């Protein structure tokens, strides 16, 4: 009597080892309305490999606007810029940092 005992578990949804798979983390660029015509642009979901302070400094210099980094419990570090800078931020992220457009989502009006 031969009994086959296979105690190994197989997870069909486990990582197959493909290095080509893109992370599911997207970068979200949003605009928020403030008083009257004033707006804020927020950038969240930047990869941790980038120094957010240096990115903020470059964005402020290139766009001639003020900005800050806000720490949120759920979202992590969020970059806030004054004004509607959505398109400019997307171009900066793709050209200067080499991120792909398909991983950047623009929200707003």
Curated annotation (Swiss-Prot):
Gene3D superfamilies: SUI1-like domain (3.30.780.10). GO terms for cellular component: cytosol; eukaryotic 43S preinitiation complex. Keywords: Protein biosynthesis, Translation regulation. It comes from the Eukaryota. Disulfide bonds: none annotated. Residues 1-22 are annotated as: Disordered. Belongs to the SUI1 family. Transmembrane segments: none annotated. This is Protein translation factor sui1. Additional factor that functions in concert with eIF-2 and the initiator tRNA in directing the ribosome to the proper start site of translation. GO terms for molecular function: ribosomal small subunit binding; RNA binding; translation initiation factor activity. One of its GO terms (biological process) is cytoplasmic translational initiation.
